[in-house]
Amino acid sequence: MSLLTEVETPIRSEWGCRCNDSSDPLVVAASIIGILHLILWILDRLFFKCIYRFFEHGLKRGPSTEGVPESMREEYRKEQQSAVDADDSHFVSIELE
């Protein structure tokens, strides 16, 4: 006799939902967490470009220039731009044989 025939199969009356007691606090908490997770996931997928662009540029602000003379601000901007321009010239060249 094979192992598959030894396993009990449920009868149709046992296939119903066994969690009829939905007043259980754990079930309520799990339902709320599941719904919130689904809502946040949908919002993330709909607005991911806006969200991550905000974090990327919002967190990359430079140091505060409050109280710094305009000439020093301009010098700092030129240094930052020259550093960016220098990084743009580094490309990896891959040649396939």
UniProtKB/Swiss-Prot annotation:
**Per the UniProt record, which residue ranges are transmembrane?**
23-43
Q: Which residues lie on this side of the membrane: Intravirion?
A: 44-97
MF terms per GO, please? monoatomic ion channel activity; proton transmembrane transporter activity
Among the record's GO biological process terms, what is one?
symbiont genome entry into host cell via pore formation in plasma membrane
Q: Where in the cell is it found?
A: Virion membrane; Host apical cell membrane
Site annotation (Essential for channel activity, possibly by being protonated during channel activation, and by forming the channel gate and the selective filter): which residues? Answer: H37
Q: Where is this site: Seems to be involved in pH gating?
A: W41
Which terms are listed as keywords in the entry? Disulfide bond, Glycoprotein, Host cell membrane, Host membrane, Host-virus interaction, Hydrogen ion transport, Inhibition of host autophagy by virus, Ion channel, Ion transport, Lipoprotein, Membrane, Palmitate, Phosphoprotein, Signal-anchor, Transmembrane, Transmembrane helix, Transport, Viral ion channel, Virion
- Activity control summary: The M2 protein from most influenza A strains is inhibited by amantadine and rimantadine, resulting in viral uncoating incapacity. Emergence of amantadine-resistant variants is usually rapid.
Under the heading Gene3D superfamilies, the entry gives: 6.10.250.1640
Tell me the residue ranges located in the Virion surface compartment per UniProt: 1-22
For the modification Phosphoserine, the affected residues are S64, S82, S93
Q: Which residues are glycosylated?
A: N20
Q: Can you tell which superkingdom this protein's organism belongs to?
A: Viruses
Lipid group attachment sites (S-palmitoyl cysteine):
C50
Where is this protein chiefly located?
Answer: virion
Misc. remarks from the entry: When the channel is activated, one or more imidazole moieties of His-37 probably become bi-protonated.
Please provide the record's free-text comment about the domains of this protein. Answer: Cytoplasmic tail plays an important role in virion assembly and morphogenesis.
> How is the subunit organization of this protein annotated in UniProt?
Homotetramer; composed of two disulfide-linked dimers held together by non-covalent interactions. May interact with matrix protein 1.
Q: Sum up the protein's function in the record's words.
A: Forms a proton-selective ion channel that is necessary for the efficient release of the viral genome during virus entry. After attaching to the cell surface, the virion enters the cell by endocytosis. Acidification of the endosome triggers M2 ion channel activity.
Protein family according to the UniProt entry = Belongs to the influenza viruses matrix protein M2 family.
Q: What is this protein called?
A: Matrix protein 2
Please give the organism: Influenza A virus (strain A/Memphis/110/1976 H3N2)
The record lists the lineage as: Viruses, Riboviria, Orthornavirae, Negarnaviricota, Polyploviricotina
Q: Which gene encodes it?
A: M
